[in-house]
Amino acid sequence: MESWLFLALILVVALLGKNMSLIIATAVVMLFKLLPFTGKWLPTIQAKGINWGVTIISVAILIPIATGQIGFKDLIRTFKTPAGWIAILAGIAVAVLSRYGVNQLAAVPQVTVALVLGTIIGVVAFKGVAAGPVIASGMTYLVVTLFNLHF
């Protein structure tokens, strides 16, 4: 019963914040809880869901390469600008930090509660986005904007 109340509270907050991603995610999880056979699915989704999400985001990021919007000349140009190097370093930093984050979640599962709360606050109150790889882009945006750099 407590999990239903917790999910309902998250849904209300998402609705008040008009955050469609969180609304859909919460509704899907609540739907899963209603279905009798999903007891076996939930641990699998919990264990592999982040990787699935990263894969979907990676596919979306690679689409401009597939459509020809981004080519080798763009890659080479990246190495010629400070903003490009910042983007590369931000990507490396996020990948390395994520490795430590995954290890911490495995060692200290209680961190998940704080992360969920922080993510909900960030998404709803500050119009943030609950996505991992996009963090590198956000870090890049911050530094590029602070130093008025361009690609």
Swiss-Prot record:
Keywords: Cell membrane, Membrane, Transmembrane, Transmembrane helix. It is a multi-pass membrane protein. It comes from the Bacteria. It is found in: Cell membrane. InterPro entries: UPF0756_TM. One of its GO terms (cellular component) is plasma membrane. Its main location: membrane. The chain crosses the membrane at residues 4-24, 52-72, 78-98, 115-135. HAMAP family: UPF0756. PANTHER family: UPF0756 MEMBRANE PROTEIN YEAL. Belongs to the UPF0756 family. This is UPF0756 membrane protein LBA0919. It comes from Lactobacillus acidophilus (strain ATCC 700396 / NCK56 / N2 / NCFM).
